[in-house]
Amino acid sequence: MAKEFSRSQRVSQEMQKEIALILQREIKDPRVGMATVSGIELSRDLAYAKVFVTFLNVLTDNADPDTVKNGIKALQDASGYIRTLLGKAMRLRIVPELTFAYDNSLIEGMRMSNLVSNVIKNDVERQVNPGSDEEK
């Protein structure tokens, strides 16, 4: 009987849920803000985990560029505490060493969506006013 998912995939899914709960309930650092765990890459031996996070306060237009750096640094500083809480929440022989990385896929997706919307809007304007295209 074949397994649908490997053990590392199952552990990473459960770890993603647990870390998201820990960030939401336990981490009180204001530099972290509203952090969302978007994915986890786990090594085959389950000793290392790369946690990808997004910050919702970065999505606003008036966001400080250093917000991401400060948030990742705060999470790196709290990684030992997060790892301790993770060890209590999950039954693993070895709790992985956590490293945090910023996941910009949400912002890139929004940028791509805006580009597509602008192209569609320009295309509709050109269809309505076919002669105005030559004036530009």
Swiss-Prot record:
One GO cellular component term noted in the UniProt record for this chain: cytosol
PROSITE patterns assigned: RBFA (PS01319)
SUPFAM superfamilies: Ribosome-binding factor A, RbfA (SSF89919)
Keywords: Cytoplasm, Ribosome biogenesis
InterPro entries given in the database record: KH_dom-like_a/b, RbfA, RbfA_dom_sf, Ribosome-bd_factorA_CS
GO biological process assignments: maturation of SSU-rRNA; ribosome biogenesis
Superkingdom as given in the UniProt entry: Bacteria
Pfam families: RBFA (PF02033)
Principal location listed in the UniProt entry: cytoplasm
Any one GO molecular-function label of the UniProt entry: ribosomal small subunit binding
Annotated localization: Cytoplasm
Keyword Mitochondrion: no
Function of the molecule: One of several proteins that assist in the late maturation steps of the functional core of the 30S ribosomal subunit. Associates with free 30S ribosomal subunits (but not with 30S subunits that are part of 70S ribosomes or polysomes). Required for efficient processing of 16S rRNA. May interact with the 5'-terminal helix region of 16S rRNA.
Subunit structure: Monomer. Binds 30S ribosomal subunits, but not 50S ribosomal subunits or 70S ribosomes.
Family, similarity comment: Belongs to the RbfA family.
Protein name, UniProt field: Ribosome-binding factor A
Species of provenance: Yersinia pestis
Lineage of the organism: Bacteria, Pseudomonadati, Pseudomonadota, Gammaproteobacteria, Enterobacterales
